[in-house]
């Protein structure tokens, strides 16, 4: 009996020590944050442990950036069709008196290393107006699993020059040059859908 109690205490101690911090984003107000960007801004930089950002179902109409040094993050949606991040910037659009280029037309930019995106959709809904990036990745060791990247021109910009990205069980669609960039990208069991000839 004494051994069982000691074993249980040790097991719980190991589990508690390995438990990661979970942040919840809910656009309906039921989480720690209402917007994804508020959550990303609150993440401590240069972490030693992994964190999870849990995004509840809904459409999050915002432009989001996971900045450099916000490494080791699991960004977990509910389901690909249920958790959607949508924005509509495009090259040539004027925002605050400045004309955007391809490089800042993204809906979501992942600049940190060691990031997992799981079960969500990232969409640029600008339409056929030119370059309009849905997801831009700059960090190294990025893993996309069961995600949808939706757009027209330049949907997925694998921008990092020394970046490795693994795309698994995902759906990517667009019209012109919709997957581009200098990164090393491995596509596995994924659907690439061209919406135009």
What are the functions of these language-model segments?
Residues 109-197:
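Right-handed parallel beta-helix
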Residues 27-29, 34, 50-52, 71-131:
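Right-handed parallel beta-helix/beta-spiral solenoid domain characteristic of secreted/periplasmic
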Residues 58-62, 80:
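Short active-site-proximal "capping" loops at secondary-structure junctions
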Residues 20, 48-51:
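Loop/turn elements at helix/coil->beta-strand transitions in domains of secreted/extracellular proteins
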Residues 4-15:
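Sec-dependent N-terminal signal peptides
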Residues 28, 56-58, 170:
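Active-site-proximal beta-strand/loop segments in catalytic clefts of secreted hydrolases
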Residues 34-45, 61-70, 75, 111, ...:
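Short, T/G/N/S-enriched strand-turn elements that build extracellular solenoid repeat scaffolds
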Residues 13-41:
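Right-handed parallel beta-helix/beta-solenoid
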């Amino acid at each position: 009996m004494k051994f069982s109690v000691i074993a249980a205490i040790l097991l719980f101690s190991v589990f508690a020590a390995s438990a990661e911090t979970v942040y919840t984003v809910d656009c309906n107000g039921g989480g720690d944050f209402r917007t994804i960007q508020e959550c990303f801004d609150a993440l401590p930089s240069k972490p030693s442990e992994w964190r999870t950002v849990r995004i509840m179902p809904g459409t999050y109409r915002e432009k989001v950036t996971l900045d450099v040094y916000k490494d080791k993050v699991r960004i977990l949606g509910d389901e690909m069709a249920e958790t959607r991040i949508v924005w509509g910037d495009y090259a040539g659009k004027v925002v605050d008196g400045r004309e955007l280029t391809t490089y800042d037309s993204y809906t979501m930019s992942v600049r940190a290393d060691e990031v997992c995106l799981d079960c969500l959709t990232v969409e640029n809904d600008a339409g056929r107006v030119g370059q309009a990036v849905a997801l831009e990745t700059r960090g190294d060791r990025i893993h996309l699993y069961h995600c949808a990247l939706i757009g027209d021109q330049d949907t997925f910009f694998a921008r990092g020059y020394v970046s490795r990205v693994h795309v698994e069980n995902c759906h990517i669609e667009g019209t012109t040059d919709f997957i581009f960039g200098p990164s090393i990208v491995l596509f596995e069991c994924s659907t690439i859908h061209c919406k135009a000839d």
